[in-house]
Regions:
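Short aromatic-enriched loop/helix-cap "lid" or pocket-rim segments at secondary-structure transitions
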Residues: 1-3, 61, 202
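An alpha-helical appendage that flanks or caps ligand/catalytic pockets
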Residues: 2-36, 77-183
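Core active-site phosphate/anionic-ligand binding loop and the adjoining beta-turn-alpha structural block
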Residues: 30-33, 45-54
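Hydrophobic faces of well-ordered beta-strands that scaffold small-molecule active sites
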Residues: 45-50, 67-70, 98-105, 187-189
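A conserved active-site cap/scaffold subdomain adjacent to cofactor or substrate pockets
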Residues: 55-76, 81-82
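Active-site-proximal loop/turn and secondary-structure-junction residues that shape catalytic pockets
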Residues: 73, 106-108, 193
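Generic C-terminus detector
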Residues: 179-211
Length: 211
């Protein structure tokens, strides 16, 4: 446990081996197995690979695992990663066919205008990343255009490409189009909304929009 909790420069290189080891620890106890996960052994917990690059896509494909892509903040490689994953997928005991999920940002509110205002929190946060001043999620503002420079806006909007912002109809239509275009099996909705009540309401409206 201690060694697995430490980060080192070799962590990335060792990651594939660590995933295989974890899968074995969650499987049936083998004869001669020196380390046993308690609890864990025999639970067959489904493993996913979450990534934002082609490395994770290839690893998930070669291990026959479901793959989730972090396109809610790193959208550029989404299509290439999904294509690579599907082409190189090798069936496993957990999964017989490719199974993919994509992360998207969802900001749903009763009106498009209200949803766009809620969205300014994460827009400010990503602009702060561009400035090199990351921090906590700020409250929404009325005029995002006065907050960022054209360069900051371009960078933030590029990272937030897969964001669905609006009333339930707008969000629902956008998500259905996204699923149709990418062919993903699941969507992971991320809603970085400053007010907790508004965040819960956004998830409720999202659920209603997909019924």
């Amino acid at each position: 446990t201690t060694s697995r909790g430490k980060f080192s420069a070799a962590a990335g290189e060792n990651f594939p081996r660590d995933v295989v080891e974890l899968r074995s620890l969650l499987g049936p106890l083998q004869v001669g197995q020196r380390v046993q996960a308690v609890p864990g052994t025999g639970l067959e917990v489904p493993l996913w690979i979450l990534g934002s690059s082609l490395f994770g896509a290839r690893l998930a494909a070669h291990l026959g695992l479901p793959y989730a892509f972090a396109s809610h903040f790193a959208p550029q490689a989404l299509r290439d990663a999904l294509d690579l994953y599907r082409v190189e997928f090798q069936p496993s005991g957990q999964l017989k066919e490719p199974y993919a999920m994509a992360g998207v940002n969802v900001f749903a509110a009763p009106s498009d205008a209200e949803a766009k205002r809620l969205f300014t929190s994460v827009q400010q946060q990503f602009a702060a990343l561009v400035r090199g001043t990351p921090g906590q999620l700020p409250p929404p503002i009325d005029d995002i255009e006065s907050y960022w420079s054209p360069a900051e806006k371009a960078h933030a909007c590029a990272m937030l490409e897969y964001s669905f912002v609006g009333d339930p109809e707008t969000v629902g239509q956008g998500l259905r189009r996204f699923v149709e275009q990418t062919g993903v099996d699941e969507v992971m909705a991320v809603s970085a909304i400053h007010d907790h009540g508004a965040r819960l309401a956004s998830y409720r409206l999202l659920a209603e929009s997909m019924m």
